[in-house]
Regions:
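A broad helix-preferring feature
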Residues: 1-4, 18
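Sec-dependent signal peptide recognition
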Residues: 3-11
Length: 218
């Protein structure tokens, strides 16, 4: 009788072992599931996921994704959206709480747009949930054309505004999931010139200025 039970039980155990992989186990924490998923990736697959346009990994159920999305004063380049004042204008309000409310609204719109595009199986640039926002570089030289993206020349004000932007975009710290993922840019001494920003080395910045002015917002 015991042998007969084992005869029927062993195939069931074998089927159970061939079930959903552990990284799809919803009872595990997101951190643990991510850790398990990364272990399944090959080196080449990991490298492709580091690009702003990530390829799909079909064997693991990972869909393509574009990390390049912007929301400096509203959801950018993804159809109609609410347009708020430029960051330099919001900084002039000296009102961090208002900035939080602005980006809380922005995150709502971004999620709605992402839901729509995903329903159309579209995952192009500017349709995702990872925002290259806020710009917390220090605006010292008015010749820098991107100064309007910043919160001005003061590191303290820039820091306070930057914190509220991130909180508004990502949602409550104790939430189960982030609404969006914010990315403060451009680390660290990026305040012009623009044309050679990928090769320019700001060697004239003194250590004290670096740590007291440019790094605090990050």
């Amino acid at each position: 009788m015991m042998k007969e039970k084992l005869f029927y039980l062993l195939p069931l155990l074998a089927l159970a072992s061939c079930g959903e992989p552990s990284y799809k186990d919803a009872s595990l924490s997101p951190e643990r599931r991510a850790e398990l998923l990364v272990k399944e990736l090959t080196l080449e697959e990991k490298a492709h996921l580091m690009m702003d346009g990530s390829r799909s990994v079909e064997r693991l159920g990972i869909k393509p994704y574009n990390w390049w999305n912007e929301a400096l004063h509203g959801v950018a380049r993804a159809g109609l959206a609410t347009v708020f004042p430029q960051p330099i204008g919001m900084a002039a309000s000296f009102n961090p709480e208002m900035v939080y409310e602005v980006f809380n609204a922005v995150s709502d719109e971004a999620r709605a747009k992402n839901t729509y595009y995903a329903s159309q199986d579209s995952r192009e640039r500017y349709q995702g949930l990872t925002m290259w926002t806020p710009t917390v570089n220090i605006y010292r030289d008015p010749r820098w054309g991107r100064g309007i993206e910043t919160y001005g020349e003061d590191p303290y004000l820039t820091s306070r505004m930057g914190v509220m932007v991130v909180k508004g975009l990502q949602g409550p710290a104790d939430g189960k999931y982030d609404k969006l993922h914010a990315c403060a840019k451009h680390f660290a001494v990026h305040s012009g010139p623009e044309w050679n920003r990928h090769s320019f080395n700001a060697e004239n910045i003194k250590p004290r200025d670096l740590y007291e002015t440019y790094l605090p917002p990050f």
